[in-house]
Amino acid sequence: DNGGDAPLGGPADYGSSAPLRGKKGSEYEGGVRVPFIAAWAKPDAKNKFQKKYPIAQNAVQLQQGTVMDLYPTILSVAHVKSPKHYALDGADLKKLLQGKEDKNHRDDFLMHFPHGEHRANYFTTYRKGDWKLIYYYNPETTGVPTWKLYNLKDDPYEASEVSAKYPEKTASMIELMKKRL
C-alpha cells in the first residue's frame, strides 16, 4: 500500500516509496504505483478453478490495473454475477493474470482528490499510456502551477515537468481528463 507509517513520524507520516517520487496518497507515482503479486497458494493442474483461471508463473505484467479491478476479478473466479444496478468501475484481470495482453483493458487511470481536511493540496491526476497530467485545485495557496505534465516512459521519477515543452499533449490530456471526470 505504498509505505507504512514512518518510524519517527506521526500517524499520517508515511515512509518513502523511493526511487519513485511521492509517498502514500500523493499525486506522484510513489503515491499510487504498487507492485501486485498474484499466485495460487498451491499450484494444482487438476484444480477446477486453476484450470479455468490460470495465473502465469514467474511473469511480469506491464499493463496497469487498479484496486477497482479486484472485485470484478473475484466475481469472475467465483462465477458470481454482480448485483443488478451495481456499477462496476473495474474490469476482470483474467487475461493480465494469465500473462497475456488485454486490448480491451483500460490504459488510463484517474485519481481524484479535490477534497479532504487532511490534505495539504487538492489534485486530480490522469494517466494515459506513458503520459501523466496533474491538476491542482488551489495553486495560489500551494505555490504550484495549475497543470503539470510528465512523460513516465522517459522520466519515471517525475523529475522533469514538461507541459511547456508539449503544449499539444497537455491540451489533449486535459480534454481526456475532463471526459473521465
Q: What kind of region is each of these model predictions?
A:
Residues D155:
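Intrinsically disordered, low-complexity polar regions and short flexible loop motifs
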Residues N2-G3:
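Active-site metal-binding loops of divalent metal-dependent hydrolases
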Residues A171-L181:
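Short, intrinsically disordered, charge-balanced linker/junction segments flanking boundaries
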Residues F36-A38:
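Short glycine- and hydrophobic/aromatic-rich loop-to-beta-strand nucleating segment
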Residues A6-E29, K46-K48, Y53-A59, Q63, ...:
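C-terminal cap/loop subdomain of S1 sulfatases and analogous C-terminal strand-loop tails that border
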Residues S160-E168:
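Active-site-proximal N-terminal segment of extracellular/periplasmic enzymes that hydrolyze or transfer
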